[in-house]
């Protein structure tokens, strides 16, 4: 393949990844409008967001090995088709339940595409230096896409209805299909590699149980028995998955990969970077709109400061990692992200009273977001290189899937944990003025809706109390984010200082599990 053709292929797969990443966060700015139009309750709001990374995380391991079997070009193109169909269904969803289902279908297409994009890069760019740069661009697109999602959502909501945030995907999918069909190298894959669908179901059961338990545990009026049942389902799903993989001749995940500290550290760094990215953007876009009364577009543009820091740092990391190794970039990126999260909290107007930042100056948040984005760009690019650069060639599809699962688990955890903490602390700390309707305790959205029906004086008192309670949750979520990134920097620094183990022996032939 000629040099120009390789780089145009990189553009094509990067566009595919950009679509996937944008759809992870495009709803953040659309949530207030969507909630009002579809009458979604707080639980449905979180499921609308989480259905996408949840299904992706459950299917990615299977999608990687399926790509090894049928060919990564076929998986990429098939994923694009599914993504386009699901985007159309989501755009015209008539209810929260229908939108949750469409988001899950979107995730099926995304899960087919994501491992294929990275595997196509690895097989196309044979020169190590070029491959590291390509992986750097790929990794940066993932973070930039999540940062651009709120901007795109805000822009479209200024001119169209909320369904446009999904419908915009369709023409891009068509262009990527044409380019992918022309540029991507063919290959029939290896027909001797089976696809273990049951294992994907087991992972999905474990993830659904775990996420449900987290959300139930932070809900007012929680039922302990329900939480226990959800945790039992999660434990059973994950246990059955691990046992099945250890018996399989062709497992979805070779646990020997995790013995390499570089691969394990890359997985942890990728997950934590996405945890922080999703968490910061979720709570910040809500605060900018619901507390500071910014338009969706204005909120999205402010959050774009994250991408301003991420894009150049990711490209720089891609060009440096072959000389420095992943350790300084991963650890340095996580430490920088910690500082960025704390700086964002300190400079958020109205949150830290003694700094005296006036609420009419939202631009104060941008320095913290730039710093946080720069850290995530460093960490995620180095994490990609650590995983894909150290996995055996015959495990390319598996390694790509493991990396993508790390991203989705991080995003899923960020939304589930931080979103639940935000809502739970709001409900626990809101002190409504006497005579205020009880519905305002459910969420800040509900408080705003309730305030619209009150007199100006009552509305102001109610919103002051609601904003104060929301900021309690906002503060805690950013502190949790900073603490998680700091802990990750310590963990990866220690793991990456360990000696690299000898290559694991090839799998012995065993009877497939029944």
Positions of PLM-derived features:
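Intrinsic disorder in cytosolic terminal tails and internal cytosolic loops
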Residues: 1-3, 454-467, 495-514
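Extracellular/periplasmic helix-loop-helix junction of adjacent transmembrane segments
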Residues: 30-58, 292, 297-302
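Interfacial helix-cap and linker-helix signal at transmembrane-aqueous boundaries
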Residues: 34-35, 66-67, 152-160, 214, ...
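Helix-breaking motifs and short loop linkers at transmembrane-helix boundaries and internal kinks
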Residues: 39, 71, 92-98, 160-161, ...
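Hydrophobic transmembrane-helix bundles of small-molecule transporters
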Residues: 136, 158-270, 276, 283, ...
